[in-house]
């Protein structure tokens, strides 16, 4: 089982400024894991050194849609030095926006994400569809935008993994339909154990055959070590039945010590492997 750790597992420390994205690979390595998933939402530019700050220089403003090259270089170097593999570069996209400046912004964002994934040696990009559930016009716009960016990703040998998340992709049948529309080895599903609104077992059976990346979400555990809201046996069985052989990225969403939450999640995955 190829287990990775998502930077989201350290969300409290990242938001509080106690940890920087570039240092996550070292943190993951120190916890005993060899693979990491990183999110661009934490790609805040590094502050200038002390001397530069004394002369009044400030860090450039954070722009999630325009990746800071200096910060990316630090991420890349730290990942290499830590000896960890980057299994996924994670972005929050919206393929359903209407024509106009916002849609052009999304196209530029996706192009930048592909370039960044290539620069960081990430084999795939986790993305979101956006939109509102059951909005077929939004679905059509998502298909149109994916049609324009998928060839760019293919040229860089970078895959897209669309997560079952809010909006259009919250319906497993719609997400499966979207992926099947393209029949491309460069487009699949990022299946998140926790993001199912209805019957989780049915949703997983729908999405698991299309999964090219997986998020093992967790929040709280009982005395037996089981996740209190998610049946991990069922989730792992669904992956095994589908013949899934890719990475499983731990996303600990709780607020306790991440090291403990991550380990408990790994223990569950290995218990039912």
Give short role names for the model-derived ranges.
Residues 40-43, 93, 129, 218, ...:
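Residues that line or immediately flank small-molecule/substrate-binding pockets and catalytic motifs
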Residues 37, 88-90, 126, 161, ...:
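Conserved beta-strand positions in the central sheet of alpha/beta enzyme cores
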Residues 9, 21-22, 28, 62-73, ...:
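N-terminal-biased segments
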């Amino acid at each position: 089982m190829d287990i990775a750790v998502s930077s989201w597992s350290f969300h409290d420390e990242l938001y509080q400024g106690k940890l920087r994205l570039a240092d996550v690979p070292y943190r993951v390595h120190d916890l005993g894991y060899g693979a990491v998933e990183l999110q661009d939402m934490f790609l805040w530019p590094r502050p200038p050194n002390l001397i530069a700050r004394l002369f009044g220089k400030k860090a450039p403003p954070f722009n999630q849609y325009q990746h800071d090259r200096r910060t990316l270089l630090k991420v890349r170097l730290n990942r290499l030095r830590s000896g960890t593999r980057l299994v996924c570069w994670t972005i929050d996209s919206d393929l359903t926006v209407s024509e106009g400046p916002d849609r052009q912004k999304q196209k530029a964002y996706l192009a930048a994400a592909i370039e960044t994934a290539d620069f960081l040696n990430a084999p795939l990009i986790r993305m979101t569809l956006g939109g509102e559930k059951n909005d077929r016009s939004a679905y059509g716009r998502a298909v149109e935008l994916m049609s324009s960016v998928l060839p760019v990703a293919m040229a860089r040998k970078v895959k897209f993994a669309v997560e079952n998340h809010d909006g259009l992709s919250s319906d497993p049948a719609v997400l499966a339909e979207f992926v099947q529309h393209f029949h491309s080895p460069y487009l699949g599903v990022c299946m998140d154990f926790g993001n199912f609104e209805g019957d989780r077992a049915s949703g997983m059976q729908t999405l698991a055959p299309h999964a090219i990346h997986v998020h093992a979400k967790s929040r709280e555990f009982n005395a037996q070590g089981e996740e209190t809201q998610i049946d991990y046996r069922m989730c792992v069985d669904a992956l095994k039945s589908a013949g899934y052989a890719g990475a499983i990225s731990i996303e600990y969403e709780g607020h306790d010590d991440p090291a403990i939450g991550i380990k408990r999640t790994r223990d569950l995955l290995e218990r039912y492997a």
